[in-house]
Amino acid sequence: MTIKSHVLRGLLATAVASLVAGPALAANIFVIGGKPDDPFWSRVKKGAEDAGVVAEAQGGSVTWLGPQNYDNLGPDAAELIRQAIDQGADAIVGPDWVPEAMDPAFEAVTAAGIPLVIYNAGGLEAADKLGAMNYVGAVDYKSGFAAGEYLGNAGHKNGACVNTLPGAANIEAFCSGFNDGIIAAGGTGSVLQLPATAFGDATAVAQAVRAHLLQNPEIDAMFAIGDGDTNATVSGIQQAGKAGQVHVCGMNFSDTILANIQAGSQDCAIDQQGYQQGFFAVSILNNYVNYGVTIPTREILTGPGIVDASNVELVIEGVKAGVR
């Protein structure tokens, strides 16, 4: 049995037992996440809310707080963390997207004696630095590295990472990992950096990709940081007349991305299993607040995994259910 299986079985067993026994203290858990129309974060939110069913049955609650956009990501997220403290959170979950802006707010969480789990961004290093109980998520650098290595090993040697959230530590790590991965496979890597306002703007991303490819015809591989940006990157490649010549891998996926992988217009997607990030983080804190239960495996990894033509059919049902 894998470590992940042990962790999942432990969480589920504790959740069932806690429903029978009844809580010592109802946990009001606040979760900091992405903006409302971000497809990846909708899956994270579903995971948090599904875990919240147990918390609510015990008289607790799960409250989701997210920014309206990513234009001022670090300061906006820090303000959401402070709001959670002010609203009397018993426990807080949050990603360490922009450490220089967000770490003082996280430090205020632990200084107030509020249990904290870092998820999605920051890794165990951030959890250690901030005094968090656990880190739940993928290792961002390794996710990018997996994409670069995959495309490089497939024979594509000139890669570019499309970064639409400059300054976000996890996105910078994606791109750094991608470049190192394709270099390790004998290629070269670079970054196409766009302003944060371009994130989720399909037209802006597609136009930028088209222009970049026309200016840099040697590029034959691209990596995008989210499912919306990946779709836009595929569109930009097509607009540049480079379909079949420039190969794409992206973070996360959706119905459209899986269809693109089936059709051959996208090579792979990196799966960080956002649903599990939300589910595990909330479950850990609910059990801790109510019963003092801890998970000794402090780094709970949900990725990276690779979805490509070899396993895409197995993933489709999970996407239909809204959990992958």
Regions found by a protein language model. Give the residues of each.
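Hinge/cleft segment of the Venus flytrap/periplasmic-binding protein
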Residues: 166, 170, 182-185, 190, ...
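Hinge/beta->alpha junction and helix N-cap segments in small-molecule ligand-binding domains
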Residues: 33-45, 62-77, 97-98, 121, ...
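Sec/Tat signal peptide C-region and signal peptidase I cleavage site
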Residues: 20-26
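Flexible loop/hinge segments that line or gate small-molecule binding clefts
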Residues: 99, 104-142, 252-267, 316-317
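Bacterial N-terminal signal peptides that target proteins for export
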Residues: 2-12
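Hydrophobic alpha-helical
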Residues: 82, 90-111, 178, 197-260
